[in-house]
């Protein structure tokens, strides 16, 4: 018999539909239709997700979340409070107890640190809380107490802790090294707050089962990394670090040695003055001896440019990132110029617009320079695009050029003369005068381009009139 009315659908069909909606949206949309739907929602629906995110959903959430907690607490799978306005109000109104026996994931965004401290002990009674994400906008001075409470959660596998306003070296993490009885179950740990070497090792002493570690702000609080006791994390295979303080390459090397882990994926972002980070031979030695299982390497080094500041230059041997070590692993050096920065990147090779490169001989000429800024002299009096390019040429030759900003023909010609090995060129927006009023530099550029034999492929992304380049 064909179903002619939505109401004639079986309960199981509605349960399938409910899986695509937030719990408050379900109450808002269905609970007032009739008695059947009201009872259907109150009874035993499948696991529900409760999420407060964008402002438009605030009213629906506020009007219905208490009903969800009253009637469906046992079916609640996740509670995600992303609102900057209501997180503290809602979190403080919830009584967390063992009746949340299906709750697996909690997110508290912009939660007050004192409220967080009062809630965390209550979460120990949740039998299936596997994932916890915290973002506090308070100004904590000591995060050690928060970590003690987090490590007491018996079932947690994933923890992300962000202290948005904790952006200075006044923040400390007073935490002793864990005993065997204190070790927890965390396998994925993401920390976004200041953290010194000794504090980091104290934290991970509580996580012997750690598989992935990401910390976004490693600070050097005058701590000797050599004096810290080594740690054994046999399951750690994925490590991501961001360094924004003066931590040398040698200190990083000691840190890697003391982790005693078989990393397969390593990601490093750094803004420091130590140009040893750009020494391919030092990296090769470190990876061969300390990270022999490494399969993926992601590296980002930013060289900062500013007036009245001497940007450190690399004076080592040039073109070392195209040795067999790098080519066999298909880890390719790329360079990007953004406002005030030359960014050096190493990452696995990906197909580009001009072709798929397969052989190592061709990979040796895959180094690309991308320019998001072509006229820094607009903002500074003494720094020019040529300074950025020469900084890069100290490290490597360039074979591919991409320009992601508007550029005039005269400026492009000057850049290409600095890069005689470039063989592909991709331009986002090239400004050339109309043919009837070509300026001298436009004619000179077109003549230069027509006689250029090295460049074999050119892509103009936003050319409105192709007659301009004929």
Predicted ranges, named:
Residues 1-470:
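Eukaryote-biased activation of long, low-complexity terminal tails and linkers
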């Amino acid at each position: 018999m064909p179903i002619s009315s939505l109401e004639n659908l079986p309960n199981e069909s509605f349960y399938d539909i409910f899986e695509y909606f937030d719990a408050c949206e379900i109450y808002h949309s269905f609970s007032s239709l009739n008695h059947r739907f009201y009872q259907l929602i109150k009874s035993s629906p499948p696991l529900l997700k409760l999420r407060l995110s964008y402002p438009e959903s605030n009213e629906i959430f506020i009007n219905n979340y208490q009903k969800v907690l009253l009637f469906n607490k046992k079916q609640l799978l996740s509670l995600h409070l992303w609102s900057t306005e209501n997180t503290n109000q809602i979190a403080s109104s919830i009584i967390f107890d063992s009746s949340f026996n299906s709750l697996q994931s909690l997110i508290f965004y912009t939660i007050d640190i004192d409220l967080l401290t009062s809630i965390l002990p209550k979460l120990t009674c949740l039998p299936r809380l596997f994932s916890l994400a915290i973002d506090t906008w308070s100004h904590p001075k000591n995060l050690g107490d928060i970590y003690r409470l987090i490590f007491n959660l018996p079932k947690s596998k994933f923890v992300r802790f962000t202290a948005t306003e904790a952006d200075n070296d006044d923040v400390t993490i007073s935490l002793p090294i864990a005993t065997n009885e204190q070790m927890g179950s965390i396998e994925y740990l993401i920390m976004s707050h200041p953290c010194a070497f000794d504090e980091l090792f104290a934290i991970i002493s509580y996580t012997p089962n750690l598989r992935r570690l990401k910390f976004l702000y490693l600070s050097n609080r005058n701590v000797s990394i050599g004096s810290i006791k080594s740690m054994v994390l046999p399951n750690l295979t994925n490590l991501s670090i961001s360094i924004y303080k003066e931590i040398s390459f040698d200190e990083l090397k000691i840190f890697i040695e003391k982790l005693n882990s078989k990393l397969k994926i390593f990601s490093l972002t750094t803004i420091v003055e130590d140009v040893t980070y750009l020494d391919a031979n030092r990296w090769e030695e470190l990876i061969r001896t300390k990270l022999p299982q490494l399969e993926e390497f992601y590296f980002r080094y930013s060289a900062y440019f500013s007036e009245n500041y001497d940007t450190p230059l690399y004076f080592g041997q040039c073109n070392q990132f195209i040795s067999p070590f790098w080519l066999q692993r298909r880890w390719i050096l790329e360079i990007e110029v953004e406002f005030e920065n030359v960014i050096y990147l190493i990452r696995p090779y990906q197909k580009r617009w001009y072709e798929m490169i397969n052989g190592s001989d061709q990979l040796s000429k895959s180094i690309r320079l991308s320019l998001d800024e072509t006229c820094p002299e607009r903002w500074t009096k003494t720094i020019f695009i040529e300074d950025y390019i020469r900084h890069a040429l100290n490290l490597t030759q360039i074979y591919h050029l991409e320009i992601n900003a508007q550029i005039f023909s005269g400026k492009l010609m000057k850049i290409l003369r600095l890069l005689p090995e470039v063989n592909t060129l991709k331009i986002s927006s090239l400004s050339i005068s109309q043919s009837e009023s070509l300026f001298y530099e436009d004619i000179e550029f077109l003549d230069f381009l027509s006689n250029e034999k090295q460049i074999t492929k050119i892509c103009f992304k936003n050319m409105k009139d192709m007659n301009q380049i004929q």
